[in-house]
Amino acid sequence: MASLPRRLLWSVSYIVRESFPIVSKRNCVSLLQGSWRKVLSVGVGTSLCAIPVGQRSEPTLSSESLIKRAASLVADSSSTFLSQTTYALVESLTEYTTAVYTLISLQQKYSSLLDKINSNEESAIWQVIIGARVQINQLKEQYMKYESSWQRAVSLSEMAAEAAYQSGADQASMTVRNHIQIVQTQVQGARDQAHMAEVQLAASQTEEIKRTITEDKGNPPSGGSPRNSLSEEEDIPEAYLRED
């Protein structure tokens, strides 16, 4: 029985040599042996591919780590909200301050030209001044709206900083608190500039009213002067009218 495969191999070799004389005995055997090697290689490769390979999985995060990460994200979001509201408020305060100084300049220029212009020119200048005052009121309403949003953003950031601290995200908490201090300083500086402009505007208006009263005593009003009618409508704080 053991010689049966050998006989079969020689029979196949004989048939191949008879059909293809060029092929020698050695080449025929090599061909058959090479074919078996290829089949064996393919079979082994297929078997290896069928073996399951274990995948590396991420380590499971604890609940504490997830809470800490979430608190840090909340802190970052609150800082972004605070930055946007701070920018809007500071820009609005700056525009308001500029408009106030513009009105002061218009009033001073009007006072210097008062004796050099006629009634028509005086009315035209007062129309410009009235427009400047309307713009100031609009800008004031705008910055007050932004200030409300900014105050809410500060409160939210403070709560986010505290939540981050309680969750163990100390770095995020410290970053938010430092950011709050920085924006508070920026807003306070813009507020101070606006307050200084308001003080100068009130003083300028007070001087204008006093000048008008003095002129009216010497020259009774003929009625219809824009300066007289508008000065009577001015609401000047008592602190600026009181003489110490």
Swiss-Prot record:
Residues 1-57 form a transit peptide. A motif (IAP-binding) lies at residues 50-54. It comes from Xenopus laevis (African clawed frog). Residues 208-218 have a biased composition (Basic and acidic residues). This is Diablo homolog, mitochondrial. GO terms for biological process: intrinsic apoptotic signaling pathway in response to oxidative stress; neuron apoptotic process; positive regulation of apoptotic process. Keywords: Apoptosis, Mitochondrion, Transit peptide. Residues 208-244 are annotated as: Disordered. Pfam families: Smac_DIABLO. Homodimer. One of its GO terms (cellular component) is mitochondrion. SUPFAM superfamilies: Smac/diablo (SSF46984). It is found in: Mitochondrion. The gene is diablo. Acts by opposing the inhibitory activity of inhibitor of apoptosis proteins (IAP). Promotes apoptosis.
